[in-house]
Amino acid sequence: SMASIKGNKSSEMGLHEEVLTGRTQQVFFNPEESENFFYHDAYDVDFNKRTEIDASNIECLDINRRIRELMAEGYGTIVIKNPGSKHSIGVGILNKLNLIIEGSLGYFGIGSTDGPNVRISGRVGWSCAENMMAGKVVVEKNAGSCFGAAIRGGDLICKGSVGARSGIDMKG
């Protein structure tokens, strides 16, 4: 009872006086408000402004760098042609973006994202769309193992088959 803890050190510090009933640490937002939340360095893109990247002779680091440069220029729809199953394409996109990939990706494609809508016309290797926070990824063919591991939100769709451990550690 409260009488027995009055003499405790925690009681002297005021730890037993705050009423916690009916309180929560959760913050609730409605969907309309969440559309206006952006990262401080997010780009203002126009989905009607469209461009293409021919990835046939470009390394994956340079492809990702080029995506960011184009977003900085206001492009909201980017088409990547000839991805050649390269690894780690489209990772770390924390922005609204329509990303269309005409072909297949290797390992770790479209990982650690928050916001883009991605359509992949081919297949993806293992660990595609890991740690996705928001947005949508649609794979037209098959996906490897660990597809969508550790996603927290968003929509992840594979129209073909997926490998083992798909969706492991999901929190969304």
Which role does the model predict for each range below?
Residues 1-169:
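Charge-rich, low-hydrophobicity low-complexity segments
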